[in-house]
């Protein structure tokens, strides 16, 4: 892993785990989501990162990445191109039901993914500040999103 390869290394990590991975800002992510048919219960990982090289004697010795990493799952009952997705959600679902049905599991998975990726790639996970993003994007999927800081 080079100092500047964290986004591509994270993409490879996610794809090797079988997750959908999207790198970019909200507008780009929304456009990708609009044109993607997600399989039932597949995990969607979103990353929107910026970086700051740490420099000594005019040379970068490490890079600090910050931004958002979000984990979600599209789970509504519909068939598109022969793929049916199903869910335990409904339009009148309370926040507590969303938490019990999806958000708790996604919260735990987010931390597992971040910790595993950091440990496997000699990265320091400096901070994680997570939130619940309900009905995110035109996709209307629920995500657990974290503002993160990582140093390589």
Predicted region positions:
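Acidic-leaning, charged glycine-interspersed low-complexity segments
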Residues: 12-13, 22, 40-42, 96-151
